[in-house]
Amino acid sequence: MTSIIKLKVFSGAKDEGPLCYLLQVDNDYILLDCGWDERFELKYFEELRPYIPKISAVLISHPDPLHLGGLPYLVAKCGLTAPVYCTVPVYKMGQMFIYDLVYSHLDVEEFQHYSLDDVDMAFEKVEQVKYNQTVVLKGDSGVNFTAMPAGHMIGGSMWRICRITGEDIIYCVDFNHRKDRHLSGCSFDNFNRPHLLITGAHHISLPQMKRKDRDEQLVTKILRTVRQKGDCMIVIDTAGRVLELAYLLDQLWANQDAGLSTYNLVMMSHVASSVVQFAKSQLEWMDEKLFRYDSSSARYNPFTLKNVNLVHSHLELIKIRSPKVVLCSSQDMETGFSRELFLDWCADQRNGVILTARPASFTLAARLVELAERANDGVLRNEDKHLSLLVRKRVPLEGEELLEYKRRKAERDAEETRIRMERARRQAQANESDDSDDDDIAAPIVPRLSEKDHRSFDAIENDSHCFDIMAKWDNQQKASFFKSTKKSFPMYPYIEEKVKWDDYGEVIKPEDYTVISKIDMRKGKNKDEPVVVHKREDEEEVYNPNDHDEEMPTKCVEFRNRIEISCRVEFIEYEGISDGESTKKMLAGLMPRQIIIVHGSRDDTRDLYAYFTDNGFKKDQLNTPVANELIDASVESFIYQVSLSDALLAEIQFKEVSEGNSLAWIDARIQEKESIDNMLVAGASQLTIEDSLQEDAVEVVEEDVIPMETFQDDQNKQEASEENVAEGEKSNGQSKENDENASSIPIETQPKIRGTLILTPLPKKQIPVHQAIFVNDPKLSEFKNLLVDKGYKAEFFSGTLLINGGKCSILVERLDSKWRVLSQKTFTNFGSCSTTSLLFCK
């Protein structure tokens, strides 16, 4: 092992924070995940910022925000340009996760960290890969990586990173070896004793229920809630584990014996329709049983979800009658529909809340999990029923704030109208005839638009199917200074567009096939006219939280509210992560040479560390870093990269050995090639010394030659000039201060930058005598062929190698699998093939 391997931990070690690690393999830097949580702390991004120009690739393991939530920020605000690698489902579902996150925050606050455009720009850098597809890192480093199924979420990956020399680095966090309804479990069969294992200890010390018992408990709690005429909210993520629960509940609703078909099943998020649509097209990433055909021999897609209602807003949810079961995002309940529904439903004792995961301890969901574990069959204790929560929401403007908003909006509208009218006036002037004698052409009259027509004018101006018969002002600016009898664009202007073609024919523009599907009655100030909204026939209507900004102005408010929890609160684990006992056995079975434990609380990390030490692993093989810690995972304590000089390569004499390989002795010494920075510093110091000597010499000569009177006059002039430029020097003093400080530092005390280490050839007098070595296992038959090539007569006779008709012989006896020399007659004139002792192996 000769590679330099280091791991820098930025977040996600001995805590429940987002995951972000920087792996260094020689000169390549690979970023392993870049998550973010609801706290949106910028600390670890600032620590990561200096390394961003060095990053060669980013590997994303799972689509949830804890693994890729910080990617848009790194691309938009930190300047990340390296390619991002993930599987196809992680790419699609990751976008859904981040979209839902941004929409949820825009519903209650002004989200400033990144926008939807930043999300799109970040995912444009993603290169999608498949399982078991080997991707070679760009450059000549020889580093490649492969995604292996993790079994936790659709498309979730464990990454195997290899060098060309064959050393493996395994990065596996949040994996599941058990088979789910829609996913197959992970497998470690393809991993053979890696050099470094980077793994997580997330919830490794917590017990887990069996799948059958867990499903029965879920159905029981749902039935108890809906039969009491209550609504049941199941808190789940946006596009990951929600597929498992949606598929399970859809099957239960389809089963008439379950007794759930009379109630409504709802999946609620800002991107619910898109999540289901993507799931339909990603069956190849799921378990093989989902490819089976139904009884009608037609292809059956299990994620059609016929019994699930997809909603994207509260208005759509209200239209669905109660009792109902709602799969609601987000999982930590810090924002999103899950928090809003909890605030609305917690006061009714008929309702129920089922939590399916243990998020970070600072979240509302984590507090409710603790209360549920202390509760009696979902009913909280009296001392646990009251919580003080921060409530954030958007409210419409009222009173003075609304008047101020209308005043500013009127000013903006007036300015926009003035600009449009000025543009129209210039276009009208451009259409006037250059020929003053032509009375048939009248200048077009542009009527002044009233305040009521402003919105209609915008609709016409923005419509892609409307054309202005007046020539554009920009075209008229290119006309000649002299009058021309030829009119530019006398009638309807027409510019023929070049039709684009591809392999399938003419490229279709979707906007050419839009239809007017509905009339949106949006009432502004004194505007009752309808606004035409264009919509594609196959386009689904997705809730956009910014739509209400056009209807009425709003503002974000927040306040503390003390709530009473009367509903049932229960916890059923559906995280899809391997249990602790199985995780320990699988990781120990890999027999890695070094282990780095990340992504887990201090107790979980300590538990996994103790298991490894009790099962034969040495303490120097285990590392449990904390945030902002650098781990050196190289085998040798000191590794340096050395280059071969051209002079050494010219003197090397290679000898061919078996299987096309070549070997050579290298007799050289290690020298440090001075870096360019040191050469520049040395050159600057030399120039500084020479300049100072020249200045001193000039001053001495001038003092010897110049008379005293002239010197006194020059001194007076110099004092006067110094007074005149005093102000200028004062203004430039700040900028010169740094240069003076830098120049005042002695050159010798400045740090020396290490240069490149190279191997240079030794003088021939210093080259030692090399002893003979044997490469591989020599065979007696090969030695016979060598003698024949040298002109000797050699043949086998009863286990004896006869040379030159018996004049020189070697008596060989076979003992087990060895050839042992029993006796040997020396002979002369054998040249380079003479030897005094031989040991041949079969």
From Swiss-Prot:
Ranges of compositional bias, category Basic and acidic residues: 414-425
GO CC annotations on file: mRNA cleavage and polyadenylation specificity factor complex
S-S bonds: none
UniProt biased composition (Acidic residues): 432-441
Record keywords: mRNA processing, Nucleus, RNA-binding
Biological process annotations from GO: mRNA 3'-end processing by stem-loop binding and cleavage
Top-level taxon in the UniProt lineage: Eukaryota
Segments forming a coiled coil: none
Subcellular location: Nucleus
Biased composition regions of type Polar residues, renumbered to the chain: 731-747
Keyword Ion transport on entry: no
Keyword Mitochondrion recorded: no
Region (Disordered) location: 414-442, 708-747
Database matches in InterPro entries: Beta_Casp, CPSF2, Cpsf2_C, CPSF2_MBL, Metallo-B-lactamas, RibonucZ/Hydroxyglut_hydro, RMMBL
Membrane-spanning ranges: none
One Gene Ontology term of the molecular function aspect: RNA binding
The family this protein is said to belong to: Belongs to the metallo-beta-lactamase superfamily. RNA-metabolizing metallo-beta-lactamase-like family. CPSF2/YSH1 subfamily.
Assembly description: CPSF is a heterotetramer composed of four distinct subunits 160, 100, 70 and 30 kDa.
Function per UniProt: CPSF plays a key role in pre-mRNA 3'-end formation, recognizing the AAUAAA signal sequence and interacting with poly(A)polymerase and other factors to bring about cleavage and poly(A) addition.
The protein's name: Probable cleavage and polyadenylation specificity factor subunit 2
Native source organism of the sequence: Caenorhabditis briggsae
Lineage start: Eukaryota, Metazoa, Ecdysozoa, Nematoda, Chromadorea
Protein encoded by which gene: cpsf-2
